[in-house]
Design a protein with these regions (language model features):
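Transmembrane-helix signature of 12-pass secondary carriers
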Residues: 2-161
Length: 161
């Protein structure tokens, strides 16, 4: 094979690897979103038992993630244009990562628990806006359906588990 033929063969392989990478990242973004929103279902009985929150406070703990999601999704598109999609996805992952120790360390402190849940929601709102946007820009027309399907499938898996 000539060098030119080798280059032509390498480009499709590199493009395929990049598409696979994007599909995996789409799936992980969806999974992160699903876990952000759905993690409370498994944790709520434990929180109720150990933290001593009243029913109103427990409702607020559940709803706080939606509040954070609404707030961040209002600005996610604008921030994605200003900061870049990858940077904002990284920030969303960092917010989620930060929310875990905040929630774990909250013990019986209601306000800190709310802060952790709002951080989780902010992460979910960003992911819900920016990951599909990033996929639409990066995936070929033939792969966009796979990418958004993978995002939605793993989002649902994250909600359930």
């Amino acid at each position: 094979m000539t060098d030119q033929e080798n280059m032509k063969a390498a480009v499709p392989d590199a493009a395929k690897r990049y598409m696979r990478y994007l599909l995996i990242m789409a799936g992980l973004g969806g999974l992160l979103y699903g876990v952000d929103v759905g993690v409370i279902a498994a944790a709520l009985p434990y929180i109720e038992q150990t933290a001593g929150f009243n029913p109103s406070q427990l409702s607020q703990v559940v709803a706080a993630v939606l509040f954070g999601s609404v707030l961040s999704s209002l600005f996610a598109g604008y921030l994605a244009d200003k900061m870049g999609r990858k940077a904002l996805i990284t920030i969303a992952a960092a917010l989620f990562t930060l929310s875990i120790p905040v929630i774990c360390l909250s013990q019986e402190v209601f306000g800190i628990m709310l802060l952790g849940r709002i951080l989780q929601g902010a992460s979910a709102g960003i992911v819900g806006v920016v990951v599909p946007l990033y996929l639409a820009e990066c995936l070929s027309a033939e792969s966009r359906g796979k990418g958004t399907g993978m995002f939605q499938f793993l989002l649902t898996v994250g909600l359930v588990f």
